[in-house]
Structure formats: structure tokens, C-alpha cells
A protein has these predicted regions:
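Short glycine/serine/threonine-rich phosphate/pyrophosphate-binding segments
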Residues: 2-9, 33-34, 76-78, 98-106, ...
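N-terminal phosphate-binding or glycine-rich loops at protein starts, especially the Walker A/P-loop
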Residues: 2-37
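Glycine-rich phosphate/pyrophosphate-binding loop at beta-loop-alpha junctions
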Residues: 33-35, 128, 138, 193-194
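Glycine-rich oxoanion-binding loops at beta->alpha junctions
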Residues: 35-90, 99-100, 138-139, 145, ...
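Short, ordered loop/turn segments at secondary-structure junctions
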Residues: 25-31, 64-65, 97-98, 106, ...
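Accessory alpha-helical/coil subdomains and C-terminal extensions
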Residues: 83, 94-96, 102-117, 121, ...
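A generic structural signal for alpha->beta connector loops
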Residues: 20, 56, 117-118
């Protein structure tokens, strides 16, 4: 899902060269932006970018790094704006879940305070499906299908056990405190009331 989003974003940016010159991807997310480890996607062919749509994983890497508060860690934000200025970055798209949306917001706040004109956009992607005001986050549909299929197959396996076997099956799924993935297991039922 994250590669499909990157593909769509890069392809759309290429359709508007008057607005967006180059698209840089931060290697391993915000860490790449902070360390100026940027991937210039303009060096990739249209065909290679199109292949992202069906490439699993995250082609540009990822991280679980939450920006600290602006008040306590202003230097990291100033560094980020310096990188944006050095590469004439006018749009900042950040793909991910809750922490990524928080990062996009924090970057927009410091850019405004520092007078740097950058449009910051949080691009939702989370299997947890727990972003406010978002009905279904990209990523959730894939995991919902996978979990429902897995629970149905496990159910068939448990049902095939002999009468003298213990028929208990426990499946732990991701989703933090949201419960959407657990609820998706209900899609495995074949009959009303199961």
C-alpha cells in the first residue's frame, strides 16, 4: 500500500512539472529528511515508478521515529527546514499512521513559525484503521481480508479435529486499541449468528 501511494504521488507530480520540479523521498522516512539522505525519484524511469504499484514492502524504507516537541528540540526542526531550503522543497507529503500525521502537523507548524512556505500533507496509511475522520485507511482492507481468510481457514482446521481433541483456537492480531482488525475476523463467518 505504501508503495502504491508513492507511485501515485510521484506520477501525479510528474504530470505537473510547473508546480513540482522533483520528488525526493526521505530514506527511512523523516530520518532521511533530517539527515539529508534523500532519494531523487526523477532519476527513475516512468516504468520503474509504475512498478512500485505492485512492489511489496516500502521501497524507500520506513521508521518509527516520533519528532520531539518543538519547544524542547527546536534544532531538529530547524535542520529539517534547512534541508527543505537546500533542495527547494515546497511540498511535504508524509505517509503513515498516527505518528506520521502528527509529524506532518508538527512540520507545518514549524514551517509557519519560521516563515518557510511548504505545504504539508499527511497521507493516511495504517492497518489499525484508527485515524480520526478517516473511514477506511489504505492498508486496512488488505489486513482485513488476510485476517478474515486466515480465521476461516483456521476454523476449518479446528472443525476437522476429532471429537476428543480440544477445539480451542486463539489468534492475536495487530491493531493497538482500535479493534478494527479483530472486527474484520467477523467477515470469516459463513452463516448469520456465527
Amino acid at each position: 500500500v505504501i508503495n502504491s501511494t508513492a507511485c501515485g504521488l510521484i506520477q501525479e507530480a510528474r504530470r505537473h512539472p510547473d508546480k513540482i520540479g522533483k520528488v525526493f523521498a526521505g530514506r527511512d522516512g523523516i530520518i532521511g529528511a533530517l539527515t539529508e539522505d534523500l532519494i531523487d525519484t526523477s532519476l527513475e524511469s516512468d516504468e520503474d515508478i509504475a512498478r512500485l504499484r505492485s512492489t511489496p514492502g516500502g521501497a524507500f524504507g520506513s521508521c518509527r521515529y516520533k519528532l520531539k516537541s518543538l519547544e524542547d528540540h527546536r534544532a531538529q526542526y530547524e535542520r529539517l527546514i534547512a534541508v527543505f531550503k537546500a533542495h527547494d522543497i515546497g511540498y511535504f507529503f508524509y505517509n503513515g499512521g498516527n505518528d506520521s500525521m502528527d509529524t506532518a502537523w508538527k512540520v507545518s507548524q514549524i514551517a509557519e513559525k519560521m516563515g518557510y512556505p511548504v505545504v504539508c500533507v499527511g497521507v493516511p496509511k495504517t492497518v489499525d484503521n484508527d485515524l480520526p475522520l478517516t473511514d477506511c485507511c489504505p492498508g486496512f482492507g488488505s489486513v482485513a481480508k488476510y485476517v478474515a481468510t486466515s480465521i476461516r481457514e483456521a476454523g476449518y482446521d479446528v472443525a476437522s479435529m476429532s471429537r476428543t481433541s480440544t477445539k480451542i483456537f486463539v489468534l492475536e492480531v495487530m491493531g493497538r486499541h482500535a479493534g478494527w482488525i479483530t472486527a474484520a475476523c467477523g467477515l470469516a463467518s459463513e452463516n448469520v449468528g456465527e
